[in-house]
Every structure is written in structure tokens, then in C-alpha cells.
């Protein structure tokens, strides 16, 4: 993956996520990322594009603090989400705060309805059924097609609809 600059595009105060000049090493010797920086403005959308093996997934794993599971580590630079260093937070805490990685695969439960797929995991929430229902309606605002297909069996929806469901579930 190449970067145009090692400096973030927006100012740190404007960004919900800042990755500043990070290096990632696996097994204490294999350098897989060097000098990667990016900044995601609050309310913005950012895409990581690159060839196979360019470091997109490794960058996402670093942001999600998931590298240790694969004997990887950030050895240089900083990753800050909502004003806090990612390395100081557990992956579960990052998810609770809204830093969620949606993988390329769709990972829907084909035998469940679209809506049941969206509600997967909601049972672990502690903020009540009304908040869950409000979040579901927000997903339907972002993805009106899912509301139309909410009673359809997820396994019979298009790939794009399944990806919308994966994003909505996150």
C-alpha cells in the first residue's frame, strides 16, 4: 500500500481516527507496513485501496488492535480513535466505542431473515429494546432496500444486500 504523505490529511481535532506513520512487524522480524498514515474525519467515509498484499487488512487489524492474535505488533507511530490510543484499549472496548471492522465477506446467516441478521448480537446490549429498535430504524434509513427486504431470507438476497446487512449489523 502506498501513501502520498506521512502526515494526516485533516487536523487531529477534526478526525475521529488518526493513523500516524505506523510500522507493523510480524514475528519480531517481518516488516509488513512502514510509514502508513491516514485520517478519517468525523462523519466521513474512507476507503483503503491497493493490490493484494499491500497491507489493507493489516492496517485494519492494527486499527482494531487485533494484531497480537497473529504475533503482530505496531512498533512505531500512533493510532488514535476518539482521542485515545488504540493500543491502550482492548478490541472489545473499541467495538463498544464504535470502532468496528467490517470484513470483505458478507457473513450472513442464510436461514434467518434480513432483520434477524441485523439483530444478531443485539441480545448482548444493555440499553434496552427501544434503543435497539431505534438503531434498526437508523440502518433502514441508511439502507432503505433492507427495509423492503426485511422479511426475506438473507440467503436469497443479493451480494450487495448482504454487504449492506453486514455493515448494518456492525
Task: List the model feature ranges, each with a label.
Residues 27-28, 46, 67-70, 114-134, ...:
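ABC-type ATPase nucleotide-binding domains, specifically the catalytic core motifs of the NBD
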Residues 8, 84, 130-149:
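Conserved ABC ATPase "signature" region
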Residues 46-47, 101:
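Short beta-strand immediately N-terminal to the Walker A/P-loop
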Residues 66-67, 78-96, 124-128:
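ABC ATPase NBD Q-loop/coupling interface
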Residues 60, 111-121, 150-151:
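Short coil-to-helix segment of the ABC ATPase nucleotide-binding domain corresponding to the Q-loop/switch region
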Residues 49-54:
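The feature captures the beta-strand-to-loop junction immediately N-terminal to the Walker
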Residues 153-157, 161:
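Conserved ABC ATPase signature
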